[in-house]
């Protein structure tokens, strides 16, 4: 197993200012990070309770190693040494859900180099076992799950880099059958799933990472595993990441996107009936990619934390509870080439913490909150 080592980094002793006054001196809300070794070119980090012990665990996708690093959380902010799980070529995107009905979290993984999705089943003993590989097509780049046909079994949707979305319907034993392929050009990227129009069926929202594209696509589900032709939601520009949350506390899900190339983030306010209103884009640090939403300021209002790949930082953007945000935001330097972040309460103190993977250094950093409010 990979060794665990502590790195009392100096990165968070000072909050640095970046570009054009877009950030301000940041309050000292994070403890110094603790670091864990991961594989080469860590692409994605996710936090999830994988073994039903009520403590969040961490999965890291190591794209150059053909491995996953699984860190079992101990509930006090520390983790066991990594369990290494072998994958296909160039693992790139990951989703976690129960795919075989045993109430234990499983892993669905896009192998970019193989054109496959690997289904890796979680076991009662905390280990993982490859169940099957599903051919989906050339260059799978994003994956998400939901019950698309209302049979209480998790299904999958996969985007292929240039033009398609593939739907895989779950059988219930960890295997899947290929259902439909949908045209999703140009350059479909990240997806998120929920019922966005209130009809009881799961829908898929998608961002497009093509130049000069300034809209999102929404595939409204029919409830039988098929989807209506996509509707366009105006806004964003060459977006690369998408998530959802109720940002204005009106009971309806909103969409939050980021553009790695345009250095911007966008908010789309939902009305619960499938309509979205784009709010004004807000600029930030260089290379924003994945986003975590949660209460990071202790005011019971959702905030946004963004991983800035080219900026070497994470940005904490406090929300006002009405869909607007504090500006300038707070910026924390974390190290060279942060690739992905995840948020969870890793030590059980009721405060959201952050996990960050650094691409070149091959490490996972855990930033624990040390104060509940700004």
Residue ranges and their predicted role:
Residues 46, 58-62, 107-110, 156-159, ...:
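Hydrophobic beta-strand segments that make up the repeating blades of beta-propeller
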Residues 43-52, 72, 92-101, 121, ...:
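Beta-propeller blade termini
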Residues 20-40, 72-89, 121-138, 169-186, ...:
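Blade-edge motifs of beta-propeller repeat domains
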Residues 9-17:
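Bacterial N-terminal signal peptides
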Residues 64-66, 113-115, 162-163, 209-213, ...:
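Short glycine/acidic-enriched loop and turn motifs that connect beta-strands
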Residues 339-374:
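Blade-level signature of beta-propeller repeat domains, shared across WD40, Kelch, NHL, RCC1
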Residues 37-55, 60-63:
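Beta-strand-rich domains and repeat architectures in extracellular enzymes and scaffolds
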Residues 54-56, 103-105, 152-154, 200-202, ...:
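Glycine-aliphatic tripeptides that mark coil-to-beta-strand junctions in extracellular
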């Amino acid at each position: 197993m990979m060794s665990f080592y502590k790195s009392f980094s100096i990165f968070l002793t000072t909050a640095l200012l970046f570009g054009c006054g877009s950030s301000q001196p940041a309050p000292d809300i994070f403890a110094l990070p603790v670091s864990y070794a991961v594989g080469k070119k860590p692409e994605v980090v996710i936090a999830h309770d994988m073994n039903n012990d009520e403590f969040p665990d961490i999965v890291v996708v190591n794209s150059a190693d053909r491995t996953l690093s699984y860190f079992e959380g101990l509930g006090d902010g520390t983790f066991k040494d990594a369990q290494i799980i072998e994958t296909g070529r160039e693992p790139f995107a990951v989703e976690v859900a129960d795919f075989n009905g045993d109430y234990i979290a499983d892993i669905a993984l896009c192998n970019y180099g193989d054109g496959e999705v690997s289904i890796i089943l979680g076991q009662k003993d905390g280990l993982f076992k490859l169940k099957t590989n599903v051919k989906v097509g050339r260059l799978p780049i994003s994956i998400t799950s939901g019950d698309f046909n209302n049979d209480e079994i998790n299904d999958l949707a996969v985007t292929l880099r240039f033009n398609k979305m593939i739907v895989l319907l779950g059988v219930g034993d960890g295997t899947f059958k290929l259902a439909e392929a949908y045209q999703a050009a140009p350059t479909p990227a990240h997806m998120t799933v929920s019922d966005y129009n209130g009809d009881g069926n799961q829908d898929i929202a998608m961002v497009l990472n093509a130049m000069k594209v300034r809209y999102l696509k929404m595939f409204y589900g029919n409830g039988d595993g098929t989807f209506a032709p996509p509707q366009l939601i105006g806004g964003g520009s060459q977006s690369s990441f998408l998530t959802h949350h109720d940002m204005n506390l009106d009971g309806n899900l909103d969409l939050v996107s980021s553009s790695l190339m345009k250095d911007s983030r966008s908010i789309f306010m939902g009305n619960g009936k499938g309509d979205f209103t784009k709010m004004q884009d807000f600029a930030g640090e260089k290379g924003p990619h994945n986003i975590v939403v949660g209460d990071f300021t202790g005011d019971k209002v959702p905030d946004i934390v963004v991983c800035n790949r080219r900026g070497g930082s994470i940005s904490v953007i406090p929300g006002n509870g009405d869909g607007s945000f504090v500006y300038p935001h707070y910026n924390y330097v974390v190290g060279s080439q942060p690739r992905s972040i995840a948020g969870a309460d890793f030590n059980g103190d009721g405060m959201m913490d952050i996990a960050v993977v650094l691409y070149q250094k091959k490490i996972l950093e855990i930033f624990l909150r040390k104060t509940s409010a700004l």
